[in-house]
């Protein structure tokens, strides 16, 4: 089942206090980025955040789930209505994740 665009926009709005939130559509679901760092997935109208130690400390409830068959476990976020909670979770998670690699210029 693909994500509802209204739900995706709701998640973007709810997480916006953490930084610049962007999403990229991939096969009906979305990768979620904060300030250019991939922090989670939006799949089947659910939010999943990458597992990190600092993120685990902030979580109200630790639920590990795979967003789709064959994927690593992510933190499943059941409370997407608490904007302050989501902001704190993402702000704690981002520094623990690898920064995106600079794109190389193709050789001519």
Predicted regions: what is each one?
Residues 1-108:
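Charge-dense, helix-prone N-terminal extensions
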